[in-house]
């Protein structure tokens, strides 16, 4: 779709579940999006960067959201591998 200036705009951009790679539909009201802050290892302060994870409602219904977020954080080196 184009606006009056000729730029392409989308009304809805679907998200994908970070754990299962499923598309999160517009009517999935059980889905969540969480930002986890990256912390400087020396000072322990927030360094203005974060990782965004989206979890679909199906993963939350199964009770697997905490394990999924922990697995994703380990893969992104936010949490240590031996946690």
From Swiss-Prot:
It holds the Pfam family Ribosomal_S21e. The keyword Endoplasmic reticulum applies. Its main location: cytoplasm. The keyword Cytoplasm applies. Keywords: Cytoplasm, Endoplasmic reticulum, Ribonucleoprotein, Ribosomal protein. GO terms for cellular component: cytosolic small ribosomal subunit; rough endoplasmic reticulum. It comes from the Eukaryota. One of its GO terms (biological process) is cytoplasmic translation. GO terms for molecular function: structural constituent of ribosome. PROSITE patterns: RIBOSOMAL_S21E. InterPro entries: Ribosomal_eS21, Ribosomal_eS21_CS, Ribosomal_eS21_sf. Component of the 40S small ribosomal subunit. Component of the small ribosomal subunit. The ribosome is a large ribonucleoprotein complex responsible for the synthesis of proteins in the cell. This is Small ribosomal subunit protein eS21. It comes from Xenopus tropicalis. The gene is rps21.
